[in-house]
Amino acid sequence: MPNQVVEILSAEEIRRTLTRLASQVIEKTGDLSQLVLIGIYTRGVPLAHLLANQIEMLEKIKVAVGAIDVTFYRDDLDRIKTRTPAKTKIPFDLTGKTVVLVDDVIYKGRTVRAALNAVTEYGRPSVIRLLVLVDRGHRELPIHPDYTGKKLPTASEEQVKVYLQPVDGRDQVELLK
């Protein structure tokens, strides 16, 4: 049980961060008609939709959004709690696309590695980039986000909790010490 809960991002700060991240994606992408966002279950999916909405508001272009479940692609299945896999929803070919994988928090990099393996089953994108709301460090794999909302150095025993309106009824990021 955590001794202390510290707010890292408020709802307003999350909104501003998503606007900044959307602008960075637009800047780096070039041809937005080739852009697709793929959220990693669970909170990467609503985050991808929020990001797509921001891009649409800024550029007046609809961005395709998919969702990927990495449960069966993980290399640490024996260490995580048993869970029922969510359904991957990528109703479009990824060949030649600019794919931005979206997740709420990056920690050791294992979820992203699994997502990279899963995504390539849906085509061969021209480029795959990674966007995270919070980067807490402690990587075990050479995986680094292209877009980061907030870098948050943490101790390994601490937890970062992301709450998003569509899933949790509120927007907030907390550090549990």
From Swiss-Prot:
Q: Which family does it belong to?
A: Belongs to the purine/pyrimidine phosphoribosyltransferase family. PyrR subfamily.
Query: What is the name of the protein in this document?
Result: Bifunctional protein PyrR
Q: Report the source organism.
A: Gloeothece citriformis (strain PCC 7424)
Highest rank taxon of the organism: Bacteria
* Molecular-function annotations in GO: uracil phosphoribosyltransferase activity
The record's annotation in NCBIfam families points to: PRK05205.1-5
What is this protein for, i.e. what is its function? Regulates the transcription of the pyrimidine nucleotide (pyr) operon in response to exogenous pyrimidines.
Upper classification of the organism: Bacteria, Bacillati, Cyanobacteriota, Cyanophyceae, Oscillatoriophycideae
Give the keywords, sorted.
Glycosyltransferase, Transcription, Transcription regulation, Transferase
What InterPro entries does the database record attribute to this sequence? PRibTrfase_dom, PRTase-like, PyrR, PyrR_bifunctional
